């Protein structure tokens, strides 16, 4: 997308007939395999997508500039040693589980803002958007990404 390289892997249990979560051992194995595979790659994606937040956090910091995950239904943006970990939260509102809770789960999403700097797309900010009450209200939280390169950047020009 506009020169942005995106790669990812499906949820380990996406093809399973029953909605069971993957075991911690399976998640750790997936992370180990991904670390080994991508550490040897000649070209890395700018954004790496995967379902489970546990696997995302087990990816070596600095391997990918941006890792986007979910599964926990808890929105978060965290910078660790050269990687921005983004949990989009609940873009699907937890499916049927969204109707089985006492408190409604808000829909949420993460909107990423990039700016081209010296021919490279650089993440400048992440908007975490939360929609509640069947679309009757929303809130937005903007997280600015710390780079030595983005000091003095006019945030009105980010896209």
Locate each region found by the language model.
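Conserved beta-sheet core of the metallophosphoesterase superfamily
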Residues: 47, 52-141, 147-151
